[in-house]
Amino acid sequence: MQYIDDAEFQVAIDPDAGGRIISLKWREMEFTVPFRGQVHTYGWYPMAPWAGRIADGLITSPTTGVHQLPTNIDPPNALHGFGLSSSWQVVGPGHLLLHLPAPYKGATVEQRYEVLDDAIRWSIEYDANGCDLPVWLGQHPWFARDLDRGGSAEIEFNPGKMMKRDEKLPTGELILPTAQPWDDAFTEVRGTPAVIWEDVARIDIESDAPWWVVYSEDPEGVCIEPQTAPPDAANLGMVGEHYVEALYVFSEACFHFQDSENINN
């Protein structure tokens, strides 16, 4: 376990639990969803070498053909990559390295967590090392819906387009955003996404990521996920960058003036 204790932040990172943040406290308030029995429903974890679902867990290399990925988390689809269920090597404080298994064998992923005065900087980088399989990356923070004080979490999120979804998988068609709840991919996001606990705190998520997935269907947590491409990107003929970074800026929230559901209605 790694611990970073810096001024107003206390962060616990578990390299053996997907290299994820399992606890993040700011001003003594816990902002992460704790372990609930499933590997994909707690903490803040990396999604690599793919983010979201891949239909039937099938990924295609231009040189070695079709490969079957694990589908045990969300059958029949592959979900969120190898990173969340792997043990990561500790390189330094907040710096972790993962050597990927087959069929991505030879490739690596590095992630860094850096605690600043009022923010957490989180980056994930993929190095192919000759592997030609499709890759796209993402960050999956689970924000606790309720803190020990103040209002429940609300999402401030203003997307221009939403990818239409068929069951659990995006179709590739862009549509106008619907109202919440969401388990959907978005692009052309205006402004800075945020999670707000009225009268207590807000977290603004600053990232150049071209895609975002928002999950607001869980009673205990909400997720705003910067990604380099949408779920099932390879099957949609899309590619993603091999680097994603976001700055999670913490501040007091004295009032709440607008939310995405009001924006889209």
Report the location of each language-model feature.
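Beta-strand-rich N-terminal accessory domains
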Residues: 1-65, 190-209, 243-261
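Hydrophobic residues embedded in beta-strands of well-ordered beta-sheets
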Residues: 2, 95-96, 120-122, 193-194, ...
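Extended, loop-rich substrate-binding clefts of extracytoplasmic carbohydrate-active enzymes
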Residues: 3, 70-117
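Acidic, contiguous internal or C-terminal segments within carbohydrate-active enzymes
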Residues: 15, 98-147
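Active-site scaffold segments
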Residues: 57-62, 140-142, 221-227
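Active-site/ligand-binding surface loops and adjacent short beta/alpha elements
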Residues: 133-134, 142-208
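Glycine-rich active-site loops that engage anionic ligands at enzyme catalytic sites
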Residues: 197-231, 237
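C-terminal structured interaction module
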Residues: 223-265
